[in-house]
Each structure stands twice: as C-alpha cells, then as structure tokens.
C-alpha cells in the first residue's frame, strides 16, 4: 500500500515557522533556522504525524511563492546542507517529507527573468515567459503575464520544453539531495494538464511511490486527480463544509459533501480516492478563529481524522492558535513557539495515531448511520473491520445507531454495546473500534 494512504500530515510554512517573513535582502549569510525543526521531531512524533508538508523552502523574494532559485534553500532558512540534515532526521524518525512545488510562476528576481529584463527580446530566455509588446506595471519595456494579475508573480511558459526540463531537473536534485517523498503543487488548477502528465511520469520514474498532490479549489477534482496526473488534491469543498456545519449547527452540509464525494452510490465522485483534508492552512483563517464556539474544536478535529481522506494539521493549530485572514497573511504564518501539551493536543494525538494505524480510516468505505442538525455518525469499513465515528455539535446526546457488538472508544478507553444508546457529551465526539 502506498505510504500516503496511511499518512497523517503536519503542515509547516517554513518562513513563518522560523520567524523570517521579512523580505529577502539576498546578501545576508544563511541563518540555519530551518534546523529548529529537528528539535521538534519528538513532539511531532508524539502528535502521531508521520509526514510533513513543507511550504516553500527555496530562495524567494518574500513569501516563498515568488521563487528566485529552485536549486537553493532560502538564505533566511539556511543552506542546502541544513535542509538535508532536517530531511535526514525526519526520515530517520519515520516521517515522510513533501515539498511545495511552485511551478506556475516565479518572482521578478528569478534568474532567467532578470536576464530578460536586462537584455529584453535578445534574451535566450524570452520564451520561458509569456511576453507581449507594450509595457509592464514595473516599466520593463515589455508586457508579461502575471498570475491572476499579480505582476510580482511572473507566469512561466509551461509549453516550453526547456522550462519543463528545468523543472524536472530541479525535482531530480530535490530527490537526490533531500530524498523528498512527494510534492504539493501550488495552484495546480492553473497548470497545463500535459505538463502534469509529464511531471507525473518523471516523478514516478524517480520514486515509484512519489506522491503528487495538487492545490485545487472548485469543480470536479477528477480533472486533476486521476491515473495520468495527480494522486490527490486539496479538498476545499469539505474544508468549507467542516467549519460552516459547526457554525450553523447544520451537520447536513458536511454530510452532504462527504456523501457526494465518498458515498455508496455509483454516482459518488471520489470513492476509493485519497483527498487531502484540512481545517486551515497558510492561506486561510485559523480554525480556532473561524469557529464561533471554540468548544467545537474537539468534535471538528474528530470529524477531520475519521472522515474519508488524508488529514493534515497546520502548525500551531494543534494548540488552538488564532489568526484572521482579514488582518493579513503574516498573522496566519506566525513563528512557532514551543508549548506544553494541552487537552487539545492530547486529543488530536490520539486521533492522529489511531488514523495512521486504522485501515478502515485510511482506505475503508464510508456509510452514514445517523444525521440530525447537531449530530452525525458514520461507519468506516474495511475487510471486516469497522470504525464508528460519532460527532456531537450540540448538547449532551445519546446516539442509537443499531450496530451490534462491543466497541471501545479510542479517545477514552470506555466500552459500549453499540446496539444500545451511546451517550456523547456536548461538543464532543466518540471514535469506536471493535473491542
């Protein structure tokens, strides 16, 4: 079985995690701050995470998505040797490493675009970008395409074989130097699909179990997630449904999305596929801020770790960190501060560890058992094993789901005969396996 099917991800945005959100001056000596991740490996393992998805780590102008050099670790984080040490330490502890592949666009200081700015149409790299007659917002003497109108993000010409080869060669270096296990493709919905097919062939040639996950927002995710392109995509449909269902006290919303995606009907869209599921990330408000009632953190995390998909937790959110997107992106990407374990971290740890060891949760089918506005229960089943998840967004409630047998709540150690009524406290959850 591919490793990613049993993965539980910890998502780190390195420039924020290391407190390096200031613009790159391109002159300072490398800092070595990325090595701080090594110190947190015991805590990451204790939380039950067996994979890390790193946001951008390569030299960039400011935020990492404005790449300057795909072959060099950002000096604000450290050196290539520093990052290799981090990856080696993670692998020695059984933790997979996934990097952010930002291939749709680069920063204005990207070496090839700088050469174009200097020599204009004479540049051998002019066809690496989408250039036109006219002028740019930066008075370059030519017009170029920026990503969604952001001209500090220069669109690469992915139809150019030289550009595609440069990207593939960069990935080859990352596999050789850092032994990475996969990529998250930034704005995958913008990428040429023939490029995605070529990229998949190259990555699977480098490593047979290499994981490709794409950032997608709307539409039919099968456009990108299929045997010719990506293994997985970001499940933004359920991201919205998760927090909205708790805020509106309407479990029907998230249940509708999960049934639509993974139910038993032939028309269900993604049954048997592994989408990346999350409650927050570096682009959106923290879940503790999004929830109207923070006492809902436990049941929403229980739902995340028991619904179909690959769960991911954004660094700091395991402690209930807050940050509002309306206050700017930097607040979403705060420096990591070591904290003592809390009731929430211990709760997430139990869920994460159980998820990685439970085949019903990793690859099992989904069957809805109970649904009301405030309460939701479902079963995950695989080869005779059953896991039952009970989510209570309301006041104290007793579930009657009609499944026989004695089951153990992995969160409390209590046992129940599920053919009888099962009490679940307000704003809480139970996750059962056969006793």
Language-model features, listed with the residues they occupy:
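Aromatic/acidic polysaccharide-binding cleft in carbohydrate-active enzymes
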Residues: 227, 273-295, 300-342
């Amino acid at each position: 079985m591919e490793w990613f099917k049993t993965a539980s991800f910890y998502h780190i945005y390195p420039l924020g995690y290391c407190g390096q959100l200031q613009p790159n001056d391109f002159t300072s000596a490398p800092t070595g701050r990325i090595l701080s991740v090594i110190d947190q490996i015991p805590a990451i393992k204790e939380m039950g995470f067996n994979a890390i998805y790193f946001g951008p780590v390569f030299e960039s102008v400011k935020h990492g998505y404005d790449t300057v050099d795909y072959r060099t670790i950002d000096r604000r984080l450290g050196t290539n040797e520093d990052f290799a040490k981090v990856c080696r330490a993670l692998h020695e502890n059984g933790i997979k490493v996934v990097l952010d592949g930002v291939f749709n666009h680069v920063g204005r200081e990207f070496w090839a675009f700088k050469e174009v700015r200097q020599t204009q149409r004479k540049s051998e790299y002019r066809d690496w970008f989408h250039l036109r007659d006219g002028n740019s917002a930066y008075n370059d003497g030519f017009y170029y395409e920026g990503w969604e109108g952001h001209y500090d993000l220069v669109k690469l010409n992915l139809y150019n074989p030289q550009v595609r080869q440069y990207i593939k060669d960069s990935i080859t270096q990352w596999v050789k130097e850092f032994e990475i296990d996969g990529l998250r493709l930034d704005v995958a919905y913008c990428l040429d699909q023939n490029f995605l097919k070529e990229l998949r062939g190259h990555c699977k040639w480098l490593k047979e179990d290499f994981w490709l996950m794409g950032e997608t927002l709307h539409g039919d995710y099968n456009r990108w997630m299929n045997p010719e392109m990506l293994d997985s995509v970001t499940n933004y449909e359920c991201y919205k449904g998760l927090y909205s269902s708790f805020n509106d006290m309407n479990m029907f919303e998230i249940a509708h999305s999960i049934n639509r995606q993974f139910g038993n009907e032939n028309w269900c869209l993604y049954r048997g596929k592994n989408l990346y599921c999350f409650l927050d990330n570096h682009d959106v408000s923290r879940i503790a801020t999004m929830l109207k009632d923070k006492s809902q953190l436990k049941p929403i995390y229980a739902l995340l770790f028991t619904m179909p998909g690959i769960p991911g937790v954004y660094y700091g959110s395991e402690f209930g960190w807050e940050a509002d997107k309306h206050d700017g992106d930097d607040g979403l990407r705060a420096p990591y501060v070591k904290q003592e374990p809390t009731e929430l971290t211990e709760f997430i740890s139990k869920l994460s560890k159980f998820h990685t060891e439970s085949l019903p949760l990793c690859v099992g089918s989904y069957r809805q058992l109970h649904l009301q506005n405030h309460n939701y229960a479902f079963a995950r089943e695989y080869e005779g094993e059953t896991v039952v998840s009970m989510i209570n967004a309301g006041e104290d409630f007793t579930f009657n789901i009609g499944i026989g047998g004695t089951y153990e709540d992995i969160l409390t150690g209590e046992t129940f005969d599920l053919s009888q009524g099962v009490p679940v406290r307000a704003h809480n959850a139970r996750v059962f396996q056969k006793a």
